[in-house]
Amino acid sequence: MTLDQISRIQALVAEIADLSQTFEGPSERFMVDGLPFLRKSEELVTLVQSPAEHATSLIIKTMETAVIRTLLSLNVLQTIPTTGSITLQSLAVATETQESLLERLLRVVTKTGFIIRENGGYSHSHTSLAYAGPLGALFAPCYDEGIRALVRLPEYLSVKDKEEAKNARYSLFTWNEGQEGKATFEILSTMPARTEGIHTLAMNVQHLRPYTGFFDYSKLVSEDRERPVFVDVGGGNGHVIKEILQAFPQIRPEQCVLEDRAETLELARTTGLLPAGVQLLEHDYLTRQPVSNAKAYHLRAVAYNLGDAELVQLLKQIVPVMGADSKVLIAENILFDDNSTVFSTVSDMIMLGIGGKERTEQNFREVLYEAGLTIEGIHRAPGLEYGIMEASLATS
C-alpha cells in the first residue's frame, strides 16, 4: 500500500469520525443514494480491500442475493418469527422444504449476518426482518426482472451481436425466457405474480418520478377550444392526465387524449381515475399518430422501454402530424454524465435486459435529431435526475 493510500485512509477515517457526530440513522427509503456517512464508509472499505478480497466479497454477495430471493420464494423469511428463533427442523416442516437444502441456503446468509444463528435456532436480523415485509416485495421484482437475466449477459453476448438490442422482441429478457419474438408485455401477461411485483415496485419509486412540480403545463393551453392540448402516448391507466388536470385546472379534460392498448384502456375505464370528457383512443405507438396538431404529445415511462431505433421510429410517427407550435414532452430520467444515482443505474440495467435504455441529455439529443426534432428546454424535478425533455420540430 502506498503512502498516498495510507494518507487517504487516515483522512477518510477522520471524515467518518466527524460525520458520526451528526449521524441520526440510515435512510429507510428504497432506491435512494446512501447518506454521506454510509458513502464514506463504503469508500473506506473499497480503499482498504485488496482485489482478491473484492472478488471474494463479490462472489459471496452474488450468492447471497440469489439465496435471499430463494428464501423469499420458499416463504422462509416470512416463517422465521419476528421475535425469538426457530429450529431448522421446524422451519423445514413449516415451509415444506428439504431440511438439508435449507441448511445449505441458510449457511450463506448466516455467514453474511443477514440471518442470525444461535443455540441451534435461526432468528431475524433487523435487515432480514425488513425483507420479510414490504422490502422483500420491492427486492423480488428487481431480482426477477433485472438480476435474473443479467447473470446470463456474458453468455447472451457470446451468442448474439455485442450491442444493445435493436428490437425489444429480441432482447436479453425474451432470450432468457425462451420466447424471442414476443413483446415483453405479452410474456409478463402470463406471469401475474411478476406483473404485480413490477406494479408494486413502480408505486414505491414514485417519489423519484413525480408527475408535476417541475413543468408548467398551463403554457400548453390553446385559445382554440377544439384543439387537442395533451395527448398522453402510451399513458397507461390515466394517472398522468389525472394529476395534470388536478394541478392545472385551466386545461379542459375534453382537450386531453389517453392512448394505449385496448386492455390498458379498459382498465382506465374501470378505475374511474379520469374525469369525464377525456378521450380514450386505442393506439400502437409504433404506428402513425392518429391525433393531428395537438399542442403536446407526452411520453412518460415510454422512451426508456425502447432502444434508440424503436424510439426514433415512435417519434417519426408523431412528427408528420405535429403543428408548427406542437411540442413533444419526454418525461424520463435524464442521466448525469458522471455520478448517476443508484435508481437510474439500476433502472438502466433492468432496461438493458428488456431492450430499453435510460439516457443522458446527449443520448436524447441524438435520438430527437434523427427523428427531426430539436430540444427547446430541459426541465428537471428539483434534486432528481428525472425531468422533461421539451422538443419541437427542427427547422431546416
Curated annotation (Swiss-Prot):
Gene3D superfamilies the UniProt entry points to: Vaccinia Virus protein VP39, Winged helix-like DNA-binding domain superfamily/Winged helix DNA-binding domain
Source organism superkingdom: Eukaryota
Protein name stated in the entry: O-methyltransferase gsfC
Knockout consequences: Impairs the production of griseofulvin, but accumulates the intermediates griseophenone D, griseoxanthone C and griseophenone H.
EC identifiers of the protein: 2.1.1.-
Biotechnology: Griseofulvin is a spirocyclic fungal natural product used in treatment of fungal dermatophytes.
Keywords, sorted A to Z: Methyltransferase, S-adenosyl-L-methionine, Transferase
Recorded GO MF terms: O-methyltransferase activity
Example GO BP: terpenoid biosynthetic process
Pfam families xrefs: Methyltransf_2
Job of this protein: O-methyltransferase; part of the gene cluster that mediates the biosynthesis of griseofulvin, an important antifungal drug that has been in use for a long time for treating dermatophyte infections. The first step of the pathway is the formation of the heptaketide backbone by gsfA which is initiated by priming with acetyl-CoA, followed by sequential condensations of 6 malonyl-CoA units. The resulting benzophenone can undergo a spontaneous dehydration to form norlichexanthone.
UniProt source species: Penicillium aethiopicum
EC primary class: transferase
Pathway: Secondary metabolite biosynthesis; terpenoid biosynthesis
Catalytic reactions of this protein: griseophenone D + S-adenosyl-L-methionine = griseophenone C + S-adenosyl-L-homocysteine
Organism lineage string: Eukaryota, Fungi, Dikarya, Ascomycota, Pezizomycotina
Binding locations of S-adenosyl-L-methionine: G234, G235, D260, D284, Y285, R300
Similarity annotation: Belongs to the class I-like SAM-binding methyltransferase superfamily. Cation-independent O-methyltransferase family.
